[in-house]
UniProtKB/Swiss-Prot annotation:
Organism the protein comes from: Chlamydia felis (strain Fe/C-56) (Chlamydophila felis)
HAMAP family, sorted: Ribosomal_bL25_CTC
Gene that specifies this protein: rplY
A single GO BP: translation
Pfam family, one: Ribosomal_TL5_C
Record carries keyword Ribonucleoprotein: yes
Keywords: Ribonucleoprotein, Ribosomal protein, RNA-binding, rRNA-binding
Protein name in the entry: Large ribosomal subunit protein bL25
Length: 185
């Protein structure tokens, strides 16, 4: 996803409020744990992108931020919402550097849930873990991991170890954790 961002002044509350009122989202780009730039993201463009995004996929989405004539590849590290309207009011981006490891959550997608044996026998499919915490290089980031639940019967589970994890991803979460279960109703 490509975003054109503009520079902004530092964090005066009145300035941040004005940015939000004019259709912007205040944001910060971090690199190596240090603040690199204070920026503004177009709220309309970002909200439109969010509405089309699959649930949980934001954490593994790589953004190309067009900032002062250069492209910065980054992940959203933190997002703040307004409590009552659930509008995005602040973003933190983490710059991706090719030779540096990054920690992120990769969403887990259950496939063939409609054909699940346990569900056809009257069971209820419940996904316990929705994302896997991993460490990897930026080139190894995948948008999601798939877990096939077609053969899952009543009272059976699938663990993180049952997911085909690509070679470049190193899981932080223990692989013995249960991802999905089919229980009797």
């Amino acid at each position: 996803m490509e975003l054109v961002v503009t520079s902004r002044e530092t964090d005066k509350k009145s300035l941040l409020k004005k940015i939000r009122q004019t259709g912007g989202i205040p944001a910060v780009i971090y690199s190596g744990g240090k603040s690199v730039a204070n920026i503004v993201v177009d709220a309309h463009v970002f909200s439109k992108f969010l509405s089309g995004l699959e649930s949980g996929a934001l954490s593994s989405t790589i953004f190309s931020l067009s900032y002062e004539g250069r492209i910065i590849r980054a992940l959203v590290k933190d997002i703040q919402y307004q409590v009552t309207t659930y509008q995005v009011i602040h973003l933190d981006f983490e710059e991706l550097i090719e030779d540096r490891d990054v920690k992120l959550n990769i969403p887990i997608r259950c496939i063939n849930a409609v054909d699940c044996v346990g569900v056809k026998l009257g069971g209820s499919l419940r996904q316990v873990i929705r994302a896997l915490r991993v460490v990897c290089k930026p080139k190894d980031i995948v948008p999601f991991l798939e877990l096939d639940v077609r053969s899952l019967g009543l009272s059976q589970t699938r663990k993180l170890s049952d997911i085909n994890i690509p070679a470049g991803l190193r899981p932080i979460t223990p692989l013995k954790e249960v991802v999905v279960t089919v229980s009797r109703r």
